[in-house]
From Swiss-Prot:
Carrier protein for platelet (but not plasma) factor V/Va. Plays a role in the storage and stabilization of factor V in platelets. Upon release following platelet activation, may limit platelet and plasma factor Va-dependent thrombin generation. Ligand for integrin alpha-IIb/beta-3 and integrin alpha-V/beta-3 on activated platelets, and may function as an extracellular matrix or adhesive protein. Glycans are attached at residues 133, 161, 201, 250, 328, 415, 491, 525, 560, 602, 712, 765, 810, 822, 903, 915, 963, 1000, 1037. The gene is Mmrn1. This is Multimerin-1. It holds the Pfam family C1q.
Length: 1210
């Protein structure tokens, strides 16, 4: 008998605990207040609502006597939360009206439902016995519960039979009737062009109450003193099940457009002259600028608005956690209720009188208050923990957004610095006129600086990678420790269960001697309870096995990542070697051309300088001979008479001397011609060097422009990814799903990757800022960074590949240094050659002066007399000539040796230059991949952030649930020793039990106005699991979530898959008078065309400026429709052709045509075509522009553009 009492106590305590939990999660609101709520006040503080409901549930209605106090139990509180929230208004027609009972809290109490009163016929011979008043009250408390649920479902019958949309429309009609008559009930407004629409989108939580039915099997209960077999019966009971659902609600708010201020949105004084350029109404950029200008004019404080938004998001997360808890509580309540029904059947067979006093003791309010206090404390602790957790999460998110904003500002500064660097072109033109060797030295210095900067940049990422590895190891150890703690907690739970089982067995052994039938019933109940415990233990074991399997999966992923890193290392090394070989080949080809030029120069010098030296030596010898002869002839000049006589006799010798002088003059003239040719060739060589330098500078400037474009596009992609994360962060609907996600552990790694790339961009900004100060260095780096946009997106390089690349770069720089040294030697040789040329010129000038001085007296002497020579003078002249020829031979040998050294130096220089070119080409090809590898990490930031939030919420939820279960177990163990005591015996009067008629009904509480998106997710398995199978029918749009999907149906269809059509009486058109309409996501794109197009086909707009929704594909030039709705498109096309034509295409069908033709086809003219279109398009359709005839020129900034955006969804 004591075991029976214990089980009855246990079932009642569990039923009351979970009934109180369900009561706390109910959501009620007066009907009068629902009509006056604005969209901004729909998401009220859930903690305040829950506290009010708990307060109303715990009031003491003992002011009307014992009878009223007995009737106003916790079931009445549950009836208040589920019935229509209108206590003072008159019930509508068609609903069952119930009288009000006067209690202390004015609670609506419904009478018992006695429609079906089956009686149990006792066996013959049994006397008629009346039940006591206490027993009658006890049975009425159980029958009143089901009767109240029946009446509540009847009162909500009309709304249950109608759809969620109909209920919402009737509420909106009631609120619409209360508006003043001067308001206009339409979406149109009389506002002017100075007003702009601002869209606000948020998640609105809604509590859904459902009822579940249970049909127990087994024998029915018999009379109190019946004997023999009893008739078989079935009893159907219902219990409340609460669920939470999030609704996406978008509201429209009118504010002043950018440039307008004041309550009437008047134009500013400083912007009166710019009126023609400020007509954009609902542009995303204008809205962002308008927010900054309208912060002072808005009625609300921006800080308060931000604070309220954070509070709303916190409350939404709390509701999602409470939903899971309510579902679990409802399931446990079902099990305990089944146990209670089985006990109720057994009570009829017990003829003792101790049971009534035992039940009366159970209804004491001290236990009820104790349970309520414990639950309040647990919920308070849980609420504090959740507030702290969410505060930390939002703090982390805000810091991440600040870092991303600082990165964006830094990139903008880089762009500004690039614009300022264009002002240094005059300085660059002045440097082009300097000699080539200065440019080479500057290039050497720039390469040294680049090598130092690359070394500095490489050290920090390596250290960061080491820190990341240590962090990952610590996280793995922490996870192992958590698993160990989970095992310990599981063992403790099992030990507690074993102790409880031992206590139950002891109680059963003590009470086993009283009644055999009672022992069998208790054994069956105990076995059921033990089976339930075994099932829970098996579930926990399965969860543990799943955790272990997830751990193995993570370890396999880590091993796969290491293998991928090694493979990427090898592939990168092979690519680097190939690129270096290619660059070496190119540089060898260039040095070969340089060698040919130097060979031509050497040949020219050999052809000019060597003959010139020979001729100069001959002339010097002849001059020496002449001077010697003049000295000999000097005494003869004094004897003019005798010399004249001899000259007359020797005319032949004079003619020979004249011929020699003429030959000497011709040789001198030829020497002058050769000298002029040498100077001309020297000038040509210098001009060629200057032209090559100019071409080099031109190429560097072109590479600088292309590098700027690549950096701008890269930052555009990063900004789009950041905006995508920020826009979609609030739109997550499945934060309440507590399923285990094996990708949670990857969150830290992804976040670290994002942070490391932020630091790398900061280093990049610093290096670019230093490059701006040095023009040659800046141009060289821009030439290297040009290849950033040439690498395909599927190639990825990780941080470990940078070390190999830097080693190859260091080797290349060492080779370049050797090349520069050789070039410096070559420059010194060139200087020496120029010096010798100058010396030759001075010597030629001196010889010419000497010849002129010598010829003047020589011509005079020929006029006066002849020349006498003898054999001695001839011998002396021959000796002098021999010595001079020997000296010339020595000079020629010295020159040949110097030219051979010069050729050797030139060859070494060519080899070094080729090596340097191969190294630079390899770096040009490899550097762009470093930045390309960072794009997938930034695109996966959205998943990482959401998974981080879900992991933290799961941990906090598990901690709160474990604390709650521990307190309940402690309460049960404390009360176990105090309640099992002998009770007084009371007479039992016989009264037939009444069958409780239940009606399965679903009551939906709608919190806000919604258009065609109010869908109910039932626990029934759905046929479709994602949008890939196209589940939405009748033109509905499928919106994907994390674990399910939602169909946005078109009017007048509704349902999970848009298959239910609303009746004509209920199909009321949607009303947009209050500015609320269905969720409209941001979908917009703007692209331009900077390349030329000469062939017909789709126009591929290459420059992507805006792409919200990621629906435009630059590779195909097509815009894919993401949602069913009305879209607006605009296009502008420029052409120099005489005839241009094309089409606006939708899914391969030409919808619109644009054409322009000149009457005179031979005249070349510039024309611009513009057009716009508005279409209602469905999901999956594609839109593009197709050129049929004509060409599109290359122009930057571009003129040819194409844009579009989503106006509203249908």
């Amino acid at each position: 008998m004591l075991g029976l009492k214990f089980l009855v106590l246990l079932s009642i305590l569990w039923g009351r605990v979970f009934r109180l939990t369900n009561t706390q999660h109910s959501w009620t609101a007066p009907k009068d207040e629902d009509a006056s709520l604005t969209p901004n006040h729909a998401s009220a503080s859930v903690s305040e609502i829950l506290s009010l409901q708990v307060l109303s549930a715990t009031q003491n209605p003992s002011t009307q006597g014992p009878a009223a106090a007995e009737r106003s139990s916790e079931d009445d509180v549950l009836l208040q939360s589920t019935s229509q929230p209108s206590e003072t208004s008159t019930p509508p027609e068609g609903r069952h009206q119930t009288p009000l009972e006067k209690t202390g809290t004015a609670v609506v109490s419904l009478p018992l439902s006695l429609q079906d009163k089956p009686s149990i016929k006792p066996s013959t011979g049994a006397g008629t016995v009346m039940l006591a008043n206490a027993t009658l009250k006890f049975l009425q408390s159980f029958s009143r519960k089901s009767d109240q649920q029946e009446v509540s479902t009847k009162s909500a019958g009309d709304m249950g039979n109608r759809s969620a949309r109909e209920t919402h429309l009737r509420r909106s009609d009631n609120s619409r009737n209360q508006r003043p008559s001067y308001q206009k009930p339409s979406f149109e407004t009389t506002r002017g062009k100075n007003w702009c629409a601002h869209v606000h989108t948020k998640l609105s939580p809604t509590v859904i109450l459902d009822t579940g039915s249970h049909l127990p099997s087994g024998r029915g209960s018999c009379g109190w003193y019946s004997s023999g077999l009893c008739s078989r019966r079935s009893q159907k009971t219902s219990n409340a099940v609460y669920r939470m659902q999030h609704k996406i609600v978008t509201s429209l708010e009118w504010r002043c457009c950018p440039g307008y201020i004041g309550p009437n949105c008047q134009l500013k004084v400083e912007e009166q002259q710019q009126l023609a350029h400020s007509n954009q109404a609902e542009s995303h950029t204008a809205v962002d600028q308008g927010r900054a200008q309208q912060q002072k004019q808005d009625c609300g404080d921006p800080a308060m608005i931000q604070k309220l938004a954070e509070q709303l998001s916190q409350q939404e997360r709390k509701l999602s956690l409470l939903q899971k808890k309510v579902d679990n509580a409802s399931l446990v309540a079902d099990d305990m209720r089944n146990a209670y029904l089985s006990l109720e059947g057994k009570v009829g067979e017990d003829n003792s009188r101790q049971f009534q006093s035992f039940l009366k003791a159970l209804k004491s309010k001290s236990i009820e208050d104790l349970l309520k206090n414990i639950v309040k404390e647990q919920f308070k602790v849980f609420q504090d923990d959740m507030q702290e957790t969410t505060a930390q999460i939002f703090k982390t998110v805000s810091s991440l957004s600040e870092d991303l904003e600082s990165t964006r500002q830094a990139v903008l500064q880089v762009n500004q610095s690039f614009v300022s660097s264009t002002a240094q072109k005059d300085f660059a033109f002045m440097q082009e006129n300097q000699p080539t060797w200065k440019d080479i030295t500057d290039l050497k210095n720039s390469i040294m600086n680049i090598r130092q900067e690359m070394a500095l940049t490489c050290e920090k990422p390596v250290k960061e990678l080491e820190a990341k590895q240590a962090h990952l190891e610590g996280a793995l150890r922490q996870e192992h420790s958590q698993i160990v703690l989970y095992h310990q907690s599981l063992n403790e739970t099992l030990s507690k269960m074993q102790e409880a089982h031992i206590q139950l067995l002891s109680v059963l052994q003590v009470s086993g001697t009283e009644n055999v039938a009672t022992e069998e019933s208790l054994n069956s109940n105990v076995t059921k309870y033990i089976s339930v415990l075994q099932e829970t233990a098996s579930k926990q074991g399965l969860m543990l096995l799943q955790m272990l399997s997830d751990l193995h999966v993570q370890e396999s992923k880590i091993s796969n990542l290491t293998i991928l890193l090694e493979m990427e290392k090898e592939s990168a090394r092979g690519e680097c070697e190939e690129m270096l070989s290619k660059c070496r080949h190119d540089f060898k080809f260039q040095l070969k051309d340089t060698e040919e030029n130097l060979h031509v120069l050497n040949q020219t010098l050999s052809e000019v300088i060597f003959p010139m030296d020979i001729k100069v030596d001959k002339m010097s010898e002849q001059l020496n001979d002449l001077t010697y002869d003049m000295e000999i002839l000097q005494p003869l000049l004094e004897q003019r008479s005798s010399l004249q006589h001899q000259v007359i006799h020797k005319p032949k010798e004079a003619t020979v001397t004249r011929r020699e002088l003429q030959n000497l003059i011709g040789a001198i003239n030829q020497l002058n011609v050769l000298t002029k040719e040498l100077t001309k060739r020297h000038n040509l060589l210098r001009n060629e060097v200057q032209s090559r330098g100019e071409a080099f500078e031109r190429r560097i400037s072109e590479h600088a422009l292309e590098t700027e474009d690549g950096l701008n596009k890269t930052m555009t992609v990063i900004n789009n990814a950041i905006d995508f994360v920020q826009d979609n962060y609030v739109l997550k609907e499945t934060l309440s799903a507590m399923t285990y996600n094996p990708k949670v552990c990857e969150c830290n790694q992804n976040m670290d990757n994002i942070l490391t790339f932020v630091s790398e961009f900061q280093h990049l900004n610093d290096s670019i800022q230093t490059l701006v100060n040095n023009k040659e260095k800046y141009n060289f780096i821009l030439q290297i960074a040009k290849a950033l946009t040439a690498i395909p997106k599927d190639e990825k390089l990780n941080q470990l590949n940078f070390q190999n690349i830097y080693q190859l770069f260091n080797e290349t720089t060492s080779q370049v240094n050797k090349c520069q040294q050789n070039m410096s030697h070559l420059e010194e040789n060139m200087l020496s050659v120029t010096k010798t040329a100058k010396e030759f010129e001075t010597r030629l000038q001196g010889i010419e002066s000497k010849v002129t001085k010598t010829l003047i007296p020589y011509y005079i002497s020929f006029k006066k007399g002849g020349i006498l020579s003898n054999e001695r003078d001839v011998d002396l002249q021959l000796k002098v000539l021999n010595t001079r020829f020997k000296a010339l031979e020595a000079k020629s040998i010295h020159l040949s040796v110097s030219f051979s050294l010069l050729n050797k130096t030139v060859r070494e220089l060519s080899m070094a230059c080729r090596n340097a070119s191969t190294g630079t080409c390899g770096q040009n090809a490899l550097i762009p991949r470093w930045t390309k590898g960072s794009l997938p990490g930034s695109q996966s930031s959205q998943k990482s952030l959401t998974e981080l939030v879900e992991s933290i919420v799961e941990i906090k939820t598990q901690a709160a649930l474990s604390n709650l279960t521990w307190n309940v177990d402690r309460l049960l163990s404390d009360t176990l020793a105090n309640i099992v005591k002998p009770q007084k015996q009371i007479k039992l009067q016989k009264k037939p039990n009444t069958l409780k008629k239940t009606v399965n009904m679903t009551t939906i509480l709608i919190g806000r106005t919604q258009r065609n998106t109010d869908t109910i997710i039932h626990p029934v398995a759905q046929e479709h699991s994602s949008c890939s199978s196209f589940p939405c029918q009748n033109g509905g749009t499928c919106i994907s979530g994390r674990s399910n999907f939602i169909c946005a149906c078109r009017h007048p269809f509704m349902g999970d898959t848009c298959t239910v059509k609303i009746k004509e009486d209920d199909a009321v058109a949607p009303d947009f008078s209050k500015g609320s309409y269905r969720y409209a996501p941001m979908v917009a794109f703007f692209v331009s065309h900077t390349h030329g197009m000469t062939a017909p086909g789709p126009i591929l707009f290459n420059d992507l400026s805006v792409n919200y929704g990621a629906s435009y594909n630059p590779r195909t030039g097509k815009f894919r429709i993401p949602y069913l709705g009305v879209y607006i498109f605009k296009y502008t096309i420029e052409s120099f052709s005489a005839h241009i034509s094309g089409f606006f295409v939708v899914d391969g069908v030409d919808k619109l045509r644009f054409e322009s033709e000149n009457a005179d086809n031979e005249i070349h003219c510039d024309r611009v075509l513009t057009g716009d279109a508005l279409f209602e398009l469905n999901y999956g359709q594609e839109v593009w522009l197709r050129l049929v005839k004509g060409t599109i020129p290359i122009k930057y900034p571009p003129v040819t553009t194409f844009s579009g955006y989503l106006l509203y969804r249908t």
